[in-house]
Structures are given as C-alpha cells and as structure tokens.
C-alpha cells in the first residue's frame, strides 16, 4: 500500500510526536508498505513563534497539492494541524480524497496557556480541521471521549509504544547521576511552560531532581533552580541510562495527550509519579497497577505531586517493567494501519508536466485482504 503521511512535526525536532510518527513510518516500511512523508525540510521554513527550534513550512499549499498528486497515494494521513497539515487537509477536501488525522497535542490548551485566548475558540478551529476526516486517531480512550465532547465523534484508537530493546532495566545508569543523593527524581521531556516542569522543581521532597530535555523554558529554569541537575536532551542508550539511574519518574504535565516518556520509564523499571489526569490515568490506571491488570502498584497519582512521589518510591519496579511489555510498537503500527481511510473513492492521477495538479480525478476501487494489503 502507498501511504502519504503529512506532518509539521519531523526530525530534527525532538518530542514524543516526532518519535511516534517516525517509529510508525519505520514500522509501516518494515511491513513492505511504501510511505512518503511530506515534512518541513521539503519547503522554505520560518521559526515558530515562542518555539524557534520548530520550523514551520512557508507558502507550502500549492506544493503539497502537487506532491500528493504525484505520489498517487492509496491512503493519506495528516498528523498535525500546522501549515503542512492544513495544506494537505484542504487539498483532500477540495478533491474529495478520503483522509485521516491525528490528535497528538492539546493545541487548544497550549494556545490558551501561552496567549490567554479561550481554549474553546481554538476548539472551533480544531473542529474545522478534523471534521472532514474519516477518523481522528487518538492515543487513549480518555482523549477520544474528550474529542467527542467537543463534537469530534469519529475517532480511532492508536496507542503508543516503546522499544523494549532500547529501554529496559539491564544496563549502566547515567554516570552524571550515580553519585547524586537519593532518591533521584527524574523528569524527561520538552522544557516548556505547558509541560509544567516548574511544579516538579518546586516539590518539597528530599533527594535530587534531574531534568532531561531542551526547550524554550530551559534557560530560565536553570537560572532559578540551581540545585537541580539539567542534562539537556538525551537520546537512545544515553536516555535509557538516565531512566535507569532514577528512583522515580516525575511527570508533572496536565495537558499531554499520552506521555510517551511514562512508558519508557516503566520499561526501565522506574515507577511513575504524576497528577491524576488524562495520559497518566490511561497508563498507570485508577488503581495505580497499570491498565493491563497488574497485581501491584507501578506508580502513584495524586493531586499533590509530592505525595505521589512519596508513594511511587514504594511501587514495584518489576511490575513496572511487566506493564511496559504490553506497549509493542508492532501492535501500534498495525492499529494505525487498521484506521486508515478505505481508498474506495477518487484518487488523482499523476498530472502531466505543466498541468494543474489539483483538479482531475480517476476513480479506483480497492479491496483489503486479511494481511492489510490492497488490490486494485
């Protein structure tokens, strides 16, 4: 099957959205699907306001349409609500091409936090963007219910995974953390206001606080919290070693849709302390034993983050590892594939040289066999 993924989030950006999309693309290619990624490096870009390290495509509308026509995709998936996402969405709507979208980020909440604009105003924009899609992919049932409450009822469950060959409890701890006073409390992620890292750094708890990540709030937090250790962004084996060195992983965000870092921590045998909000609730569970029926606690959720940390210190590290086993990227990729829009409607032919790429259709009926492959 030939799949186009249109996304404003791509390398060299470092965040959970990019990891989720790129890992899924790799998985699809490993299943012998042809995947074309329409991403910012294909265009002139400009720095995103307040996020200069994120580059947004400039004037990409016509080019995105031409690329979609040239690629001749069987299915189109639009991952983000940025310029590339809007260009792909508008092309699909104009040409009657079915497409799916994903809701990776609580964009209405983030905009409201940063600008004071009421979140409901942004939800109107989200309904406009996602409304025409065949389905909107969501990481958790809680997020699906939230979208349905905002009049976006067509959702598809697409969870996240963890690479268990990379994130596991066996291996050396990070050398910068081994001699720190215990307990060692770790936070990993973008260092930005919406991630609520300051709530972690303000927690009145004993031990050492370590922050792994980069972002627009890093310099200010480093200057203010000199007793914390800031290691910057880490990847792969070095990131896994940071998890292993920790006694508790602290996730202070109240706005994440999932929190991929939570299952990375669990895979390394590190219990999670978080607020009882969507994301942590969908991973740790109401009973704090994980959502897959574990017998002992893998973390702690509490409206008082300090209390959550204290309880998480007594959680079962082996149970945390066992819970993470359920998060297979192969399963996640197959669920992604299952949710793609059935390609039973019109798909544009490749335009001749110099022709408009936007207006000619040819109908192609497709059927899906049990393997997920399509035959015309």
Across the structure, where does each feature detected by a protein language model lie?
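Short alpha-helical donor nucleotide-sugar binding micro-motif in glycosyltransferases
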Residues: 68, 130, 241-246, 336
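Donor nucleotide-sugar binding/catalytic pocket of nucleotide-sugar-dependent glycosyltransferases
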Residues: 124-172
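Conserved donor-binding/catalytic core segment of Leloir-type glycosyltransferases
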Residues: 176-210
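Nucleotide-activated donor-binding/catalytic signature segment of Leloir-type glycosyltransferases, i.e.
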Residues: 219-238
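Aromatic "clamp/platform" in nucleotide-sugar-dependent glycosyltransferases that forms part
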Residues: 254
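Short hydrophobic beta-strand element within catalytic cores of glycosyltransferases
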Residues: 271-276, 284-285
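A charged, aromatic-enriched C-terminal amphipathic alpha-helix characteristic of glycosyltransferases
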Residues: 314-344, 348-349
């Amino acid at each position: 099957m030939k799949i186009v993924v249109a996304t404003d989030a791509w390398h060299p950006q470092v965040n959970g959205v990019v990891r989720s999309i790129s890992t899924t693309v790799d998985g699809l290619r490993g299943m012998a699907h042809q995947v074309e990624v329409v991403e910012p490096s294909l265009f002139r870009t400009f720095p995103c306001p307040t996020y200069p390290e994120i580059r947004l495509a400039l004037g990409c509308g016509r080019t995105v349409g031409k690329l979609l026509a040239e690629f001749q995709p069987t299915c189109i998936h639009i991952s983000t609500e940025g310029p590339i996402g809007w260009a792909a969405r508008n092309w699909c709507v104009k040409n009657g091409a079915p497409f799916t979208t994903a809701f990776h980020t609580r964009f209405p909440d983030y905009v409201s936090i940063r600008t004071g604009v009421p979140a409901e105003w942004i939800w109107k924009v989200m309904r406009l963007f996602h409304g025409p899609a065949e389905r909107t992919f969501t990481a958790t049932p809680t997020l699906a219910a939230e979208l349905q409450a905002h009049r976006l009822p067509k959702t598809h469950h697409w969870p996240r995974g963890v690479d268990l060959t990379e994130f596991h409890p066996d291996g050396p701890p990070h050398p910068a953390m081994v001699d720190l006073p215990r307990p060692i409390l770790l936070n990993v992620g973008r260092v930005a206001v919406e991630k609520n890292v300051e709530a972690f750094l303000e927690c009145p708890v004993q031990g050492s606080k370590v922050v792994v990540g980069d972002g627009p709030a890093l310099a200010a937090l480093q200057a203010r919290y000199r007793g914390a250790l800031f290691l910057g962004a880490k990847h792969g084996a070095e990131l896994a070693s940071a998890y292993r060195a920790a006694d508790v992983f602290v996730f202070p965000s109240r706005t994440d849709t999932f929190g991929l870092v939570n299952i990375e921590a669990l895979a390394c045998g590190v219990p999670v302390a978080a607020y009882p909000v969507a994301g942590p609730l969908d991973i740790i569970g109401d009973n704090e034993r994980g959502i897959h029926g574990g017998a002992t606690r893998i973390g702690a959720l509490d409206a008082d983050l300090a209390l959550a940390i204290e309880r998480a210190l007594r959680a079962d590290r082996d149970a945390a590892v066992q819970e993470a086993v359920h998060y297979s990227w192969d399963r996640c990729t197959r669920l992604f594939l299952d949710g793609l829009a059935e390609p039973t409607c019109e798909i544009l032919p490749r335009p001749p040289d110099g022709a408009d790429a936007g207006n000619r259709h040819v109908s192609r009926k497709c059927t899906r066999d049990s393997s997920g492959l399509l035959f015309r």
